[in-house]
């Protein structure tokens, strides 16, 4: 296989994705250059040393990427695949590179032009899977603990072929969780919070961290897209907004509506677990607000959105996360902070913060 990695991203955010992989690679003393084509929905990063591409996808924790939806090692671009046999050249690229991979994904970038190739990708998957199994490149059954084979079509008859590691990649096809919009939700923004739960919270921890009966606050709540997700998980919610909340949410008896400015509201309860916030405001102002809640011990976990400026978007996010981390540490607070541009996000990123309490002698564990 070659010295390149491919990263999927949102169309229009290729430069941010390129800046991110270049910076993270340099931190590992791996050097190369990014190839960027605007609005293509992907970035290629070419390493100067042959073995470095595999090192990158092993050693950079995937969850630390903000703008990348998927990462994989790829070979040279396969061009002009013969219509009578597209399978053999793809198989040839993988012979001796990978054995007994657990899954095959034939994918495209998330752009309108590329989506026209999806039907073809589905048709190719069956014969290709069969041929890869015959060559022992793919295991006889799907295995979530083995590497994933990616065939990434960028145009008809043109694809990159490569692999990712299942313990350090996105588990989703094309890096996109498939979520269905609930017809009774007050707004489409509800999908942002649902996706955030899938991305930031391991499935085996949902029962503990998204538990029935928890208390939550939604700042800038109306009409209730994010509150809806909390209601669905049987939480009790303080919804803060000067606007109107959807009557369907108020009728559940789980929502208390406070007509107030989300930036000025202060909670009266001491047992709030979740804080969520999707307000249209400058990123710095929102970051400072959430930091204040965490410093004051008003919540345990928070999910919030940062609306991005037109320029220097990557720098803006990094600066805000660093500012939050610094202020929390100054106040003696340990926290896990991760950000992701979700599929359902637009010119924004979603941030998740979780306070971590270290067990001190004689001190009650505040997590429970």
Swiss-Prot record:
Protein name: Ribosomal RNA large subunit methyltransferase M
HAMAP family noted in UniProt: 23SrRNA_methyltr_M
EC number, as in UniProt: 2.1.1.186
Subcellular localization, as worded in the UniProt entry: Cytoplasm
Principal location class: cytoplasm
Organism: Yersinia pestis (strain Pestoides F)
Subunit structure: Monomer.
Name of the gene this protein is made from: rlmM
UniProt-annotated binding residues for S-adenosyl-L-methionine: 189, 222-225, 241, 261, 278
SUPFAM superfamilies listed in its UniProt record: S-adenosyl-L-methionine-dependent methyltransferases
Catalytic reaction list: cytidine(2498) in 23S rRNA + S-adenosyl-L-methionine = 2'-O-methylcytidine(2498) in 23S rRNA + S-adenosyl-L-homocysteine + H(+)
Family recorded in the similarity comment: Belongs to the class I-like SAM-binding methyltransferase superfamily. RNA methyltransferase RlmE family. RlmM subfamily.
Known function: Catalyzes the 2'-O-methylation at nucleotide C2498 in 23S rRNA.
């Amino acid at each position: 296989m070659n010295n390149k990695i491919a990263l999927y991203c949102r169309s229009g955010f290729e430069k941010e994705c390129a800046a991110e992989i270049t910076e993270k690679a340099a931190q590992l003393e791996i050097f190369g250059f990014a190839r960027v084509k605007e609005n293509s929905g992907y970035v290629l990063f070419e390493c100067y040393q042959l073995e470095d591409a595999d090192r990158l996808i092993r050693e950079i924790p995937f969850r630390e990427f903000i703008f990348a939806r998927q990462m994989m090692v790829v070979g040279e671009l396969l061009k002009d695949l013969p219509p009578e046999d597209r399978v053999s050249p793809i198989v040839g690229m993988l012979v001796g590179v990978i054995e007994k991979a657990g899954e095959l994904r034939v994918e495209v970038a998330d752009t309108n032009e590329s989506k026209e190739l999806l039907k073809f990708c589905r048709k190719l998957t069956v014969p290709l899977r069969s041929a890869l199994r015959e060559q022992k490149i793919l295991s006889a059954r799907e295995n979530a603990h083995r590497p994933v084979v990616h065939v990434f079509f960028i145009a008809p008859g043109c694809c990159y072929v490569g692999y990712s590691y299942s313990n350090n990649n996105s588990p989703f096809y094309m890096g996109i969780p498939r979520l269905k919009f609930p017809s009774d939700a007050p707004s489409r923004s509800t999908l942002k919070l649902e996706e955030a739960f899938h991305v930031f919270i391991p499935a085996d921890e949902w029962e503990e961290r998204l538990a029935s009966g928890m208390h939550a606050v939604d700042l800038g709540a109306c009409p209730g897209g994010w509150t809806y997700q909390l209601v669905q998980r049987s939480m009790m919610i303080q919804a803060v907004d000067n606007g109107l909340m959807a009557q369907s949410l108020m009728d559940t008896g789980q929502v208390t509506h406070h007509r107030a400015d989300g930036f000025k509201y202060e909670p009266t309860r001491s047992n709030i677990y979740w804080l969520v916030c999707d307000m249209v405001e400058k990123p710095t102002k929102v970051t400072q607000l959430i930091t204040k809640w965490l410093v004051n011990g008003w919540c345990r976990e928070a999910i919030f959105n940062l609306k991005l400026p037109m320029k220097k978007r990557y720098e803006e996010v990094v600066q805000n996360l660093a500012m939050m981390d610094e202020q929390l540490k100054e106040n003696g607070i340990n926290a896990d902070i991760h950000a992701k541009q979700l599929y359902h996000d637009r010119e924004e990123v979603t941030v998740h913060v979780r306070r971590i309490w270290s067990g001190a002698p004689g001190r009650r564990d505040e997590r429970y």
